[in-house]
Amino acid sequence: MGLIAAAIAIGLSALGAGIGNGLIVSRTVEGVARQPEARGQLMSIMFIGIGLVEALPIIGVVIAFMTLFQ
C-alpha cells in the first residue's frame, strides 16, 4: 500500500509541475512576442515562477520517501 501511495504522490506532483511549467513558459513567450523590450523582466519572473512550481515535486518526493520508510 505504501508503494502505491508513493508512486501516486510522485506521479501527480510531476504531472502538476509539468503542466505548470508549460503554462508559465508559454505565457512568457507570448509576453516577449508582444513586448520584446520587457524580455529581461519577464524572464526573471518566469524563473522565479518555475522555481516555485518545482518545489511541488520535491515535496512530493519527500512525502513519498516518508510513506515508504515509515
From Swiss-Prot:
Coiled coil (residue ranges): none
Gene Ontology CC terms, in alphabetical order: plasma membrane; proton-transporting ATP synthase complex; proton-transporting two-sector ATPase complex, proton-transporting domain
CDD domains: ATP-synt_Fo_c_ATPE
Keyword field contains Protein transport: no
GO molecular function ontology, one term from the record: lipid binding
Lipid bilayer topology: Multi-pass membrane protein
Cell compartments where the protein resides: Cell membrane
SUPFAM superfamilies per record: F1F0 ATP synthase subunit C
Residue ranges of the TM segments: 4-24, 45-65
Keywords: ATP synthesis, Cell membrane, CF(0), Hydrogen ion transport, Ion transport, Lipid-binding, Membrane, Transmembrane, Transmembrane helix, Transport
Family: Belongs to the ATPase C chain family.
Purpose of the protein: F(1)F(0) ATP synthase produces ATP from ADP in the presence of a proton or sodium gradient. F-type ATPases consist of two structural domains, F(1) containing the extramembraneous catalytic core and F(0) containing the membrane proton channel, linked together by a central stalk and a peripheral stalk. During catalysis, ATP synthesis in the catalytic domain of F(1) is coupled via a rotary mechanism of the central stalk subunits to proton translocation.
Oligomer status and interactors: F-type ATPases have 2 components, F(1) - the catalytic core - and F(0) - the membrane proton channel. F(1) has five subunits: alpha(3), beta(3), gamma(1), delta(1), epsilon(1). F(0) has three main subunits: a(1), b(2) and c(10-14). The alpha and beta chains form an alternating ring which encloses part of the gamma chain. F(1) is attached to F(0) by a central stalk formed by the gamma and epsilon chains, while a peripheral stalk is formed by the delta and b chains.
Record's protein name: ATP synthase subunit c
UniProt organism field: Staphylococcus haemolyticus (strain JCSC1435)
